[in-house]
Regions:
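A short, ordered amphipathic alpha-helix with a cationic face
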Residues: 43-47, 79, 91-93
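Interfacial/capping segments of alpha-helical transmembrane domains
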Residues: 86-97
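Long, hydrophobic/aromatic-enriched structural stretches that serve as scaffold segments
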Residues: 121-124
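Alpha-helical transmembrane segments
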Residues: 72-76
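Alpha-helical transmembrane segments of multi-pass membrane proteins
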Residues: 79-87
Length: 282
């Protein structure tokens, strides 16, 4: 069996090209009109809107303005800087492992897995049907849309980049484009992207700060643990997280006017003399 050659230059090109596509999916030129049908039911309207939104996400870079390119420069610079120090940061994270962090891994990692994220969306939608909540249904459907859109893009770039995972023993600059093997699907991180794609939609649909903190906090832990568990390099999780965040933002913005009634999910903590009540409003 021959030894694959490392392609640091090719890897850098693929990495930069991907970063050029990722940022500012949250700033689309196309938005729903106020008369759009509400996207809070799993029906033909939803699937039609899903297709339109997917096309808008893919075409986003063609609508960038000057401010978008300036913001891209900042994000790309951060990503390239991480790429240059991937090995050093990865080694440092490995040295910080403790028995507690290792034991927590199986639980935290679940929040980035596609099966669990899909199950979360299904559970939210079912709850929306049971409680007749357009807000919960819409949050569920947009979460699913954001996750599936993000996943489609992630899988494409994984195949094109073919970056070696840390656990293969190869360097942080080892790329094998179109190898289609699990050991060469490190860039970008699908779990980090999926976690942030859903967390962002949930945060956008709820006005409560503590929900934002919880959603983004869990997504952040998922990203960190992908490096902790030797599955990804730091630049993989940074790019995946950025992708999930901006796709989630854009999906939310594209559907911000397609609502019926109260489309937000609201929480309220009420202290009492001998108890605390958590109220959920749809």
């Amino acid at each position: 069996m021959g030894i694959r050659r490392k392609r640091p230059f090719a890897g850098a090109v693929v990495f930069t090209a991907f970063l050029f596509w990722v940022p500012f999916q949250a700033f689309p030129a196309v938005q729903d009109s106020k008369d759009s049908a509400p996207v809070d039911r799993l029906n033909k309207t939803y699937f039609k809107k899903f297709g339109q939104d997917f096309g808008s996400v893919i075409a986003s870079p063609g609508r960038w303005g000057t401010s978008d390119f300036l913001k891209f420069t900042a994000l790309a610079g951060t990503g390239v800087l991480l790429y240059g120090f991937d090995q050093e940061i990865y080694d440092w994270v490995q040295k910080q492992k403790t028995p507690s962090s290792i034991n927590a891994s199986p639980y935290i990692s679940k929040f980035g897995q596609g099966g669990y994220l899909t199950a979360l969306a299904v559970a939210m939608y079912a709850s929306g049907e049971i409680f007749d909540s357009p807000g919960l249904r819409k949050t569920a459907l947009l979460s699913l849309e954001s996750f599936l859109t993000t996943t489609a893009v992630v899988l494409t770039f994984k195949a094109v980049a073919g970056r070696a995972r840390p656990n293969t023993g190869e360097s942080a600059h080892s790329f094998h484009p179109f190898s289609f093997t699990s050991g060469y699907t490190s860039f970008p991180s699908g779990d980090a992207a999926g976690a942030f794609s859903v967390a962002t939609v949930i945060a956008e649909q709820t006005p409560e700060v503590f929900v934002d903190i919880l959603a983004y906090g869990l997504a952040g832990l998922v990203a960190i643990y992908r490096v902790h568990d030797r599955k990804h390099w730091p630049s993989d999780v940074f790019t995946g997280s950025a992708l999930g965040f901006f796709v989630g933002k854009k999906i939310s913005r594209l559907n911000k006017n397609s609502s019926s009634g109260n489309s937000h999910v609201s929480f309220e903590l009420t202290p009492h003399r001998q108890s605390i009540t958590l109220s959920l409003y749809f």
